[in-house]
């Protein structure tokens, strides 16, 4: 006995409606996948549940490419069918709004998928594509990280080399200044030693060997006579006394 015909009307029971939606959605996604393989067709499917949850399927690797292709085709077709410029402008604005809104929703959905959220409605092929995209992103991230680490390492090595050269230069300058200070200190010590050396004793001379100046001779009853520069120095006093004939003392022979 075959299955009876289902009446096409809204299911009032929420649980039955949710169960029917899940079954029909899975069948719809399966049919879309089959027709894309059997007929080599480019198929994209977008479904929103009564709660606003998005479910999609795309035979291509990226849904954005399919949407952009659809927008270009739809825009070109409407351009030919709308001769009125005013209507054409309104149509363009409506299309632009719809395009941007769909793109925002798609970006938000992809962001949730990249964070590991709302993965229940994704097929195996979409999960594989998501995994491939994440692997590619991780490769780019690791490559960029390694590049930055290599550049940072090179910068640190150059900085280390500059610091070592600067330290070597400072060490050389310090040694030169220490050498100059030691030289000045040695010179100062030598000068101090030369100033503090005891004077050597002078040889003592025999007083009898010293030639004295001839003392001026005294002449009693006469005038003071100085030294004759041509006369020979004498070391004794020459006194000349005249004979005294006075005071009844007799006379003294000269």
UniProtKB/Swiss-Prot annotation:
Q: Where is the MADS-box domain?
A: 1-61
Keywords for this entry? Activator, Coiled coil, Developmental protein, Differentiation, DNA-binding, Flowering, Nucleus, Transcription, Transcription regulation
**Could you give a GO molecular-function term held by this entry?**
DNA-binding transcription factor activity
Could you tell me which Pfam families the record lists for this protein? Answer: K-box, SRF-TF
Q: Which InterPro entries does the record match to this protein? A: MADS-box/MEF2_TF, MEF2-like_N, TF_Kbox, TF_MADSbox, TF_MADSbox_sf
Subcellular localization is given as:
Nucleus
Q: Where is the composition biased (Polar residues)?
A: 182-191
Where does this chain mainly localize? Answer: nucleus
Q: Which residues cross the membrane?
A: none
The residues covered by the K-box domain are: 90-180
Q: Region Disordered: start and end of each range? A: 182-205
Q: Which domain of life is it from?
A: Eukaryota
Please share what else the UniProt entry notes about this protein.
CAULIFLOWER may contribute to the shape of the floral meristem. This trait has likely been selected by early farmers during the domestication of modified inflorescence structures.
Q: Subunit composition?
A: Homodimer capable of binding to CArG-box sequences.
Function text: Probable transcription factor that promotes early floral meristem identity in synergy with APETALA1, FRUITFULL and LEAFY. Is required subsequently for the transition of an inflorescence meristem into a floral meristem. Seems to be partially redundant to the function of APETALA1.
Entry protein name: Transcription factor CAULIFLOWER
């Amino acid at each position: 006995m075959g299955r009876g015909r289902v009446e096409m009307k809204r299911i009032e029971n929420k649980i039955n409606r949710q169960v029917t939606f899940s079954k029909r959605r899975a069948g719809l996604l399966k049919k879309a996948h089959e027709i894309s393989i059997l007929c080599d067709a480019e198929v994209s499917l977008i479904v929103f549940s009564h709660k606003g949850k998005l479910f999609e399927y795309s035979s291509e690797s990226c849904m954005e490419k399919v949407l952009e292709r659809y927008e270009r085709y739809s825009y070109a077709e409407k351009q030919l069918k709308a001769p009125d410029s005013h209507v054409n402008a309104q149509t363009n604005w409506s299309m632009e709004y719809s395009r941007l809104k769909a793109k925002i929703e798609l970006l938000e959905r992809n962001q949730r998928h990249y964070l590991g959220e709302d993965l229940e409605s994704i097929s195996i092929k979409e999960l594989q594509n998501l995994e491939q995209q994440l692997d590619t992103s991780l490769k780019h991230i690791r490559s960029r990280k390694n590049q930055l680490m290599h550049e940072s390492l090179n910068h640190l090595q150059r900085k280390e080399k500059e610091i070592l050269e600067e330290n070597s230069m400072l060490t050389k300058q310090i040694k030169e200044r220490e050498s100059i200070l030691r030289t000045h200190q040695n010179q100062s010590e030598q000068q101090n030693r030369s100033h503090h050396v005891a004077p050597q004793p002078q040889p003592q001379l025999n007083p009898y060997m010293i030639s004295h100046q001839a003392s001026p001779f005294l002449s009693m009853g006469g005038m003071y006579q100085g030294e004759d520069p041509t006369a020979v120095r004498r070391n004794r006093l020459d006194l000349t006394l005249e004979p005294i004939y006075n005071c009844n003392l007799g006379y003294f022979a000269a």
